[in-house]
Structure formats: C-alpha cells, structure tokens
Amino acid sequence: MGILSGVETANGYEPSWLYQILKPKKSGNVINGLGEAEKRAPTPIYHRYDHWHPWILYGATFMIRKIFTPQHRKYFKRMIEMDKQGFCDIATEQINAKPEEWAKKVKEKALSLPGCDVVGIAEVDPIWIFDKDTDTHKWVIVIGLSMDYEVLKNNLDRKTLEAEITVFETYLDSQKSAFELADWIREQGYDAKGVGGPKGSELNTIPAAIAAGIGQLGKHDSLMNEQLGPCFRMSYVLTDLPLAADKPVEIGVDQFCGTCDLCTKFCPPDISGKAIGTRRNEMVRRFRQMHPFFQ
C-alpha cells in the first residue's frame, strides 16, 4: 500500500493510505438512499464541489491528482474553456414546428455532429434533478459517444493512464456536441443549455437516458446500449423546445447479465462481486432497481 496508490491483494484491493484516511464514515449507500421506501430526489456525491457532503474531500483528492498529471492537464483546460464560452443568445423570433418534426430535426442535427453516436429524447421527470439543484426545462436530449475500445481495454492490463485519457477525450467531445446542439436550438428561438464533461451536473443522467431509449441498466450499474454496449459516455441538452419523447427500450440486458460475469471477473477491488447477485433489485428511494455498491 502506498501513500497515493492502492495495491491489489489476494483478497481484492487495498486502497492507498490517503484514501483510507479520507474515506467518510457515512456510507455512499446511505447517501444514495439504499433501503429507503419514500420517493425522493437523489443526493449528489462525486464531482460536486459547490456544497459540502461527506465524500467531498475524497472526490477532490481524486480530481487534484488528475489535474496535476501532465497528460491530463490539457483536458481540464479544454473543459474550463468550453464552460467559460457559454452559449449563443436566444433568437428573438421563434421558428414553429410540430413536436414530432422538432424531434426529427434535433436527432438529425445531433447525429451530424462528430461527438454523437446515439441520441434520445425524454420529458424531464423532476425526480431526476438532484436535491441541491433546481431546473425547470421540460425536455432533455441525451447523446452518447462511443469510446475507443482498443485503447480502453488497456485498463484490463493496468495501463490506466491510456484508458483515463480516452475517457476524458470522449467526455469532452460529447460535451462539445451538446453545446453545439444547444446553440442550434437557441438559434431557433428556444432556451437550451448543454451539459457534459467529467464533472457533476444537476441531472441524474442514467434514468433520463433509460427513459430516452438510449439503453438499459446492466448489473455492473452502468448503461448498456444495443450498438455500443457499455463502452460510451453521455452528455445532454436541457431545453424548452417542444419535442416528442422516445420510449424505453427492451434489448435483453437482464437476460444477458444473468449469464455474463465479466464485470465481476475483471473488477480488482471486487466491488462488482460484492454488488452483483446480492444487491440486484433492492429498494432505492422507493424504486426497486439495481444500484452501485457504494461503501
């Protein structure tokens, strides 16, 4: 065990000395609402630094380490520059069309952008908005961008830096497309904002993506898309442009995950092994679902 780096052991994984010290007493499962029978909005944890929560020092240490890694610096710079740039002004004259027509145009525009491989639309459910945030946009457009699988699989050989870089690149390319799509909507005379990148946001993206037909939740607690599998990153656009919603899809993820144990086999900390099988479809804020095992 090192000061900053953990080690694999015969029993799984031992976190670094610093992370063991910073680990809060309040379990992430408790914050996430495991076992709660009442419906409520989720509470933000990772990558949120605008309010205090038990995991803020843990998450901040992770981000600081990444910022001071030379290979990561340019990606943080790019993220900051995009956020500073903001969005164009909303056109004073609105272009009118039927919701179904707008939905078709939005998808065509999104898929024409280099940072979008899949796109779906859902009406915003207020329960997706984190409890520290407020947002009144009616619609969310979720876009997904595939990651470079050949690079990402280096993570299985513990070549983590290469994998981290492709994750950052994909997040930011997806964010760029979300910003461009938001600007296009604003040019039509409607409010819109793009959100993305490796940081926290006001919307819980996964339930929105499920409602938008992007994919289904796998037992590894991440989204599975029919074309991209789990190997993609998402960003989204919140807007008041009148749209038509997509529907959730059934692509057989539950059946597939019932026979595949790869995420268990290749998880060094054995977190998936602790979660899968024993923690499927438990009550989380009144909803019965799969969930992360978050000690």
Task: Give the residues covered by each predicted segment.
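Iron-sulfur (Fe-S) cluster-binding modules
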Residues: M1-E123, D135-T136
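Catalytic cores of enzyme domains
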Residues: E100, K107, S112, D117-Q295
